[in-house]
Amino acid sequence: MFRLSSGLLKGGACASRSRIPQLGRSLYSTATSAGADKTQGKIHTVIGAVVDVQFNHGRLPPILNALETTNQGKKLVLEVAQHLGEHTVRCIAMDGTEGLVRGTAVADTGNPIMVPVGPATLGRIMNVTGDPIDERGPIEGVRLMPIHTEPPAYTEQSTHAEILVTGIKVVDLLAPYARGGKIGLFGGAGVGKTVFIQELINNIAKAHGGYSVFTGVGERTREGNDLYHEMQETGVIKLDGDSKVALVFGQMNEPPGARARVALTGLTIAEYFRDEGQDVLLFIDNIFRFTQAGSEVSALLGRIPSAVGYQPTLAVDMGAMQERITTTTKGSITSVQAVYVPADDLTDPAPATTFIHLDATTELSRGISELGIYPAVDPLGSKSRLMDPRIVGEEHYDTAMRVQRTLQEYKSLQDIIAILAGVA
């Protein structure tokens, strides 16, 4: 029986190796010398998801390094977030800390969180640390990559514009998607963002020649379960054959540290396939939960919040991830990101910060969904940088402009009718 919230399985991918400056873009070998020493420490304080670790001997582990300890017989990964004085680091736990006690031994891995990448991840479900949670045993024959890396150099990036056909007419006509671009699905609660992504998976991923990575960030376990079984039924995932999709989940009940990092785990897997010359589809549902988890972590670390309670590093955190989602001369990553809009307010800092990184935006309207029209795409609110006659062609561009003009006139007449009805 498939359970997203099952515990970490033994034999999950983790390896210690020497730290490489700047982390670079190269693929790393998992080999490590048998006698390599790990910096040892012990747990000093546990306050929810925040764990302080004391190192009385040796140097402190760098920021973003992964530390490992055991909690009730299971591996627990901690990520270094702050240095407190000369001997203590403050960490964020990637799993629950219930049962963790002071004095427990902690080892510095010498690396950021390392996750498995490569063909062996296809058809499997992993958590933020790359451990399988589909109860199908360990993921073997893989190499490991750090979830924190630098984006590709400008000279490696490609600017070629090509349309990605989705099969959804309102999108393909009025706000077409770019192959290798970043696409945002904006909408409030219950307007159909997840269903829209599932439709895109059905239309694109099944006919897509490359691989897909689906990352569930802070969403419902039930939706992940339904998606997994639906992919099995449609043949995207084959338990006894070649699958075309890898799934990474950090669901709603996970600690904020896991929800803040799980998107990077999925992105790291997608980057590997891209650098191997593949065209990759990366689905992230929901990017708002990434921001929300970041604000929780920021509050736990004692940082003063900025507007509406978000972390002061909101723009930096979002930019660091979005800049890695790009197309290079080797391959492409086409990213489709669902963006929850709190209270249907598009000026909220979280969706507003996401806007600036996107090539196309599809706005899902509550008013249209209330009419029973699905997908509830707002044809006037959705935009794309590809809507240019030099890219889509003169005929396509003129048709789209006429459609939008007609819809805008209809909307204006609706307002006039409402005013006259009120006067009468």
From Swiss-Prot:
Pfam families: ATP-synt_ab, ATP-synt_ab_N. SUPFAM superfamilies: C-terminal domain of alpha and beta subunits of F1 ATP synthase, N-terminal domain of alpha and beta subunits of F1 ATP synthase, P-loop containing nucleoside triphosphate hydrolases. It comes from the Eukaryota. This is ATP synthase subunit beta, mitochondrial. GO terms for cellular component: mitochondrial inner membrane; proton-transporting ATP synthase complex. Keywords: ATP synthesis, ATP-binding, CF(1), Hydrogen ion transport, Ion transport, Membrane, Mitochondrion, Mitochondrion inner membrane, Nucleotide-binding, Transit peptide, Translocase, Transport. GO terms for molecular function: ATP binding; ATP hydrolysis activity; proton-transporting ATP synthase activity, rotational mechanism. ATP binds at G187, G188, A189, G190, V191, G192, K193, T194, V195, E219, R220, Y374. It comes from Aspergillus terreus (strain NIH 2624 / FGSC A1156). It catalyses: ATP + H2O + 4 H(+)(in) = ADP + phosphate + 5 H(+)(out). Disulfide bonds: none annotated. Belongs to the ATPase alpha/beta chains family. NCBIfam families: atpD (TIGR01039). It is found in: Mitochondrion; Mitochondrion inner membrane. The lineage of its organism: Eukaryota, Fungi, Dikarya, Ascomycota, Pezizomycotina. ATP synthase subunit beta; part of the gene cluster that mediates the biosynthesis of citreoviridin, an inhibitor of the of F1-ATPase beta-subunit. Mitochondrial membrane ATP synthase (F(1)F(0) ATP synthase or Complex V) produces ATP from ADP in the presence of a proton gradient across the membrane which is generated by electron transport complexes of the respiratory chain. Whereas ctvA to ctvD constitute the core biosynthetic gene cluster, ctvE acts as a self-resistance gene. Its EC number is 7.1.2.2. The gene is ctvE.
